Structure formats: C-alpha cells, structure tokens
Amino acid sequence: MKGTESHGHSTGRAAKLHDSAGNKIGATAVIAGGGFMTDLLKNGSADGVDRRGFLRCMAWAGAGMVWTVTGGIPTSKLLGQSGGNEGFQFVQISDSHIGFNKPANADVNATLQIAIDKINALPQAPDFLIHTGDLTHLAKPAEFDTLGQLLQGARTKQVHYVPGEHDNATDDGKEYLARYGKGAKGTGWYSFDHQGVHFAGLVNSAALDGMGKLGAEQLAWMKDDLRGRSASTPIVLFAHLPLWTVYPDWGWGTSDSEEALGYVKRFGSVTVLNGHIHQTMQKVEGNLRFHTAMSTAFPQPAPGSAPSAGPMKAPAGKLRGVLGITQVEFVARPQHLAIVDATLE
C-alpha cells in the first residue's frame, strides 16, 4: 500500500483570526501570500470546531509555507528550507479521480502528471508517497491501470494507499483490494513503521452513513495495533475522509472518529492526514494535528459556500492554483512533523 504530494514557493505573513465584526476569535495563523483564508470560526460556527482549538482553512490559498507546531505554537519557514540533517520526508497526494472528464477538469491525467513532476523536482527524493484515496473516479480496471502507469514515473517508487468512496463505487472495493490490499485487514486498513514513526492507514469510506465510518472491527484492530507502543512514538494516521468534523451537512467527517482519536491521545505527537474535501484545512487540538489535502483533479467549494459539495470549475487559467500536493518532513531532534502544501502552478 502507499501515497504522495509536493511543494512550491510563496511568502507568508502571520495573521490573527477575526470574525466579520473584527473580533479576535482564534490563534495566530500563517497565511500564504496570494491566497485568502476562509474562516470557519466566523460567527461561532455551529459544528463545534471553534471550541476545539486552532483551525485554519485555505480553500484557495495553495500555501508554499512549512508550518510546524511545538508545544502548541505554530511556527513557519519558507518551502525549501531544511528542518535539519536527520529525519525523512514523504509526500501526500489525494483525490486524483482518474477517469473524471467533466468541465471542472477535462484532463485529470495531465494534472496528476504535473503533481508527479513537482515531486520529482524536489531537492531530496521523498522516502515514499501516501495517496489518501479516490485514486479513481469509477473504480474501473482501466482507471487503476492509468494511475499505476502515471505513478511509475515518480522518482519515489514506494506508494502507500487508502481507498476513497469512489474506489468502492462499482464493486465494493474488490478491484482496489486485489491491487493494493495485500497484507491489509478488512476493507484495506494496515499499519507500518518507518524510522521510528508509526503509520496507520485507515478506511472510513467503505461504509458511508451520512459521514465516514471506521466500524467496530477496524476500531478494535486500531486499539490493538497501538497497544504497547511507547507514548513517545510519533504517530501518523491517514484516511480518505477527515477524522474530525469539518462540515457535517456535507458528510465531511467520520461518525466514530472520537473513539479512534481517543486511542492516540496518550502519544506526544500525532498527525492526521486526509483528503476528500479537495482543499487544505488544518487544526491543532492538543497533541493532535489535523491536515486535509488538496486534490490533483478538481476543487470543491468551501464548506457551506454552495448548495452542496461537488466538482467546482475554476476560473479560466486558475485550475492549477487550486490543485496541489503536500510534503511532510519528519525532524528527529526535536521530534516534529513539518507540513508544506503547494499548488500545481
């Protein structure tokens, strides 16, 4: 199993989060130059995220800035600056939707290739890629074939996958599991270790019930998988749908994520990576850092800004600016993960 993402260049500035009346409502965020922030904390939003800590949504920003959190304090650095001589990097890509050919993007193969080119242009090849689901649009064998052919061109050959709901669209995930499920449990969940970091690929897209769902079997597996691990072990969870409630009206969350997150709260460093919503949103809650990635295929509206979620046609010439990849760097001393989002421009 396996996945991917990459980077770009931008300047940034620190900014306070305010509501529409100018009242301060959040922590200091780092905003990429050339983007704008969609603030879900505005007017004390009803989904509860305002009560759970630092949140920023950069639906159109395409950040080119690394952010890190140490002791709950976000700090930033320009993309390309090294975090140290020790550690490793990996790249997240998401929602490639191979097979999609509607006006929002008539050539998703080409935009995925641009993402791969960005990954290949990184100064240091990432150790591996993570793909957080919706590899394909209709789970057809030919779509999986095309994805595989494109990813063969990535300089980093190891890719970890988790499925999205589109990968289960026509056959309950049989084709996906036949290709990527070797050694996985259930509908495709698994874990692995890399240089002292424990990764768990979770499946919350196989049994949708209004929102994502992990289910009792997977939760029991997760609890057992984490049992006995030192609290100092850095943990990375990755799944397709967000493991925090972004916008329940559109099903952007996981109904039983609270139990899953309860299993990792004893660990000192937990990073949670997701896709599905096709835009970058980040939240820090204690020792948990949540991050959703841009798609390589098409954007979706910011939560609540349209009648419903779905493919959104970008203004002419702007598509690459709302698609992107995510580069993650693990720094061994002090232990933390730095995350860089970059558009395909």
Where are these regions (language model features)?
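Short acidic, glycine-rich surface-loop motifs adjacent to enzyme active sites
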Residues: 231-246
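N-terminal twin-arginine translocation
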Residues: 36-43, 47-53, 64-83
